[in-house]
Amino acid sequence: MSIRIGIVDDHPVVVGGLAAALDAIDGFEVVDRAGSIREAEGLLARDGLGVVLMDVRLPDGNGLELLARTEGSRRVAVIVISSFETTQYVAAAVRFGAQGFVLKTAPLDEVVEAVRRVATGGSAFSAGQLREGLRGPIRLRPRERDVLRRVLAGQSNDEIAAGLRTSRKTVEKNLSELFRRFGVASRLELGLRAEREAWLEIEPR
């Protein structure tokens, strides 16, 4: 019996290439595709699929947040696929009940092996990914999230202070604490790391 596969990704070239590659594997059949959270919700509730490969960043939301919402109701195993293997992404995938995590740049044989493992009830997380999952996602306090969002928006300390109705000195203290906590020396380093590691994409639960 074929492993029936669904793909959730909003990039037609990615979906087309992945679907063609998997369809060429003996025993694999790509039978459904979704390009948004709305479409993916229906796909995850559908009977007859064995494995869904799901991207994180979608036009109308975040695939990991969808996993959190559907954790107790999904009818299909999910492998998260992403261009980025950040601590936030991997930890959320583990925590919200995905069965694996694979980079989009992984060789096809790695994707095939992940699908086969998951389709037979196994896990497609590496040992390192599971360790990251057990450590959990980076947790920012509400004020840290507010300040960081405004840093990423390019606001000055004075603008952040005005927006948060606090003093410039308090904002500078907040930033100093973030610098110390994450081992960075500037707003630029802080912003680059936050973007790269997706600190703000997954809300704490």
Can you describe what each PLM-predicted range is?
Residues 14, 59:
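The feature encodes the CheY-like receiver
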Residues 33, 52, 78-79, 101-102:
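Two-component signal transduction core modules
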Residues 33-51:
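Acidic, metal-coordinating helix/loop segments flanking the phosphotransfer/catalytic sites
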Residues 35-36, 62-65:
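Acidic catalytic/metal-coordinating carboxylates
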Residues 42, 64-75:
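Short amphipathic alpha-helix used as the core "switch/output" element in two-component signaling
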Residues 55, 82:
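Active-site residues of response regulator receiver
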Residues 88-148, 199-200:
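Short, flexible helix-to-coil linker/hinge segments that flank and couple to helix-turn-helix
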Residues 154-189, 193:
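Recognition helix of helix-turn-helix DNA-binding domains
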